[in-house]
Curated annotation (Swiss-Prot):
Binding, Zn(2+): 153
Protein name: Intermediate capsid protein VP6
Major place of residence: virion
Record's GO cellular component terms: viral envelope; viral intermediate capsid
Length: 397
């Protein structure tokens, strides 16, 4: 894996800097590095593909070295270099694709394709060893079963979940009280609602709670907490739990009271925030508990009182909500996030070449399925294919 990254880094630098008119002295170190790559690769043969519709390709290396000059690089010099660069880039691209479409239930962190296994040989270590990528650094740590750490922005840590629970329900669905939520990606939105606006609740207060368990522990997280759930702020028709009918949700938004958010690890509270909104932080956690209250207003103008009558029919529904958004965090496991395209890169290649479903990943690389059942085998394989995708993205956009 290190060699593949070093190849890609060398080729990217060469493609960007070996251009017509450049002083040789400005790129002499790069050209020496490029020549070392050629010397190491010459005389070797590789085969890639042969799975799904990914075609089998054979690769052989027999390239001349780039010479020295006292002047600027001319068109002939650059054309010779470009021909070599283009072949190597095509080779690296195909090695990456070959690796991204393979998986294994055992030791999925290790190279799975024959081409990458061959590149892992000791003789290829002479290719300007470069370990500066976060993915490569963590791949090496995971390969040695040491602790890893990935920094994510808006990590896709929450499997998609959208539903509701009713704490009070009638067959006519005309006087309901409960909680509805939408968990997806890095965001939780939860709303508590009461058709009667807590008129019969103790002290005219309804208590709501929403607990979300993460599939992986997050550390040093920066989080935004807002006293609103905009996705539940407009009317909608909702299917009943048994699917036999539908009911009408017509919210009027109130501000939540006594808001508390707890971050827990293995059942122990690590951080607690009460009535604090905006930016908050959490040290390390695997569970989030949100609790908040709907309080019936003590004093109401006639127009507000008309929204919340003392008896049925209830035409509007008192609603309070929260939004919790993980802006950034560190995780020992690899995740998809908002700043990278690794999941899309891997998925698109597997779809384009009709790669058959293997023993590890779900069909279509369904992220909700993958993160919901994030087994050690999936973790190893995902870290490997994401590392390869990060290498490929250096050369192929």
């Amino acid at each position: 894996m290190d060699v593949l990254y070093s190849l890609s880094k060398t080729l990217k630098d060469a493609r960007d800097k070996i251009v017509e008119g450049t002083l040789y002295s400005n790129v002499s170190d790069l050209i020496q590095q490029f020549n070392q790559m050629i010397i190491t690769m010459n005389g070797n043969e590789f085969q890639t593909g042969g799975i799904g519709n990914l075609p089998t390709r054979n690769w052989s290396f027999d390239f001349g070295l780039l010479g020295t000059t006292l002047l600027n690089l001319d068109a002939n010099y650059v054309e010779t270099a470009r021909n070599t660069i283009d072949y190597f880039v095509d080779f690296v691209d195909n090695v990456c694709m070959d690796e991204m479409v393979r998986e294994s239930q055992r030791n999925g962190i290790a190279p799975q394709s024959e081409s990458l296994r061959k590149l892992s040989g000791i003789k290829f270590k002479r290719i300007n060893f470069d370990n500066s990528s976060e993915y490569i650094e963590n791949w090496n740590l995971q390969n040695r079963r040491q602790r890893t750490g990935f920094t994510f922005h808006k990590p896709n840590i929450f499997p998609y979940s959208a539903s509701f629970t009713l704490n009070r329900s009638q067959p006519a669905h005309d006087n309901l009280m409960g909680t509805m939520w939408l968990n997806a990606g890095s965001e939780i939105q939860v709303a508590g609602f009461d058709y009667s606006c807590a008129i019969n609740a103790p002290a005219n207060i309804q208590q709501f709670e929403h607990i979300v368990q993460l599939r992986r522990v997050l550390t040093t997280a920066t989080i935004t907490l807002l006293p609103d759930a905009e996705r539940f702020s407009f009317p909608r028709v909702i299917n009943s739990a048994d699917g036999a009918t539908t009911w009408y949700f017509n919210p009027v938004i109130l501000r939540p009271n006594n808001v508390e958010v707890e971050f827990l690890l293995n059942g122990q509270i690590i951080n607690t925030y009460q009535a604090r909104f905006g930016t908050i932080v959490a040290r390390n956690f695997d569970t989030i508990r949100l609790s908040f209250q709907l309080m019936r207003p003590l004093n109401m103008t006639p127009s507000v009182a008309a929204l919340f009558p003392n008896a049925q029919p209830f035409g509007h529904h008192a609603t309070v909500g929260l939004t919790l958004r993980i802006e950034s965090a560190i995780c020992e496991s690899v995740l998809a996030d908002a700043s990278e395209t690794m999941l899309a890169n891997v998925t698109s290649v597997r779809q384009e070449y009709a790669i058959p479903v293997g023993p590890v990943f779900p069909p279509g690389m369904n992220w909700t399925d993958l993160i919901t059942n994030y087994s050690p085998s999936r973790e190893d394989n995902l870290q490997r294919v994401f590392t390869v995708a990060s290498i490929r993205s250096m050369l192929v956009k």
